[in-house]
Amino acid sequence: TSPEQTSLLQEKGFHKAFALRCLPREVERNLWSQADFDSVTAKKLCELRARFWPDTVMLTPEQMAVVLGDLYSRGATIVSSERAYGIYFRKENTLYFVEMMAEDDRSAEELMEAAREKEVIVEKAVITVGAAQNLFLGEGARQEYGMIRFEGEPFDVSESYLRLMMENG
């Protein structure tokens, strides 16, 4: 969002409420790291979110398909295991994870290692996670991402995660 858009939204009662962390990381070579790879589909993403974030509020698969158009055009891939999932695309020698959920740091690392083996010429990754997510705590630069306007009594959204919104840039 541009500063002008942010100001306009603030004038309409919106407040900054959601943040992300971007984490650049080296990805180790590990032939033993295994994961499943799928094309990005709304159905698959909804299944994984329901499994890893059971209390999530999300669009239906039909509505999600519209939001995922940008990921389709970038050639995004879903990588998953029993303990983690991520959505990534490759640009040159870097994997860009635009969403990742894992039980712990090691599970996330295993996904990145498996993706490195699949993509071959990759050495590093940039991971985007919610600011309050427990993955790689203390790492990464915080970036404001979303805004909210409460219609009634405000409530705490500091632990909330908002991602894969419809963006125009």
Model-derived segments and spans:
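Residues at or immediately preceding the N-termini of alpha-helices
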Residues: 42, 105-108
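Amide-forming acyltransferase catalytic core, primarily the GNAT-like/NAT-type
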Residues: 10-96
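Active-site/acyl-donor-binding loops of N-acyltransferases
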Residues: 2-31, 101-105, 113-169
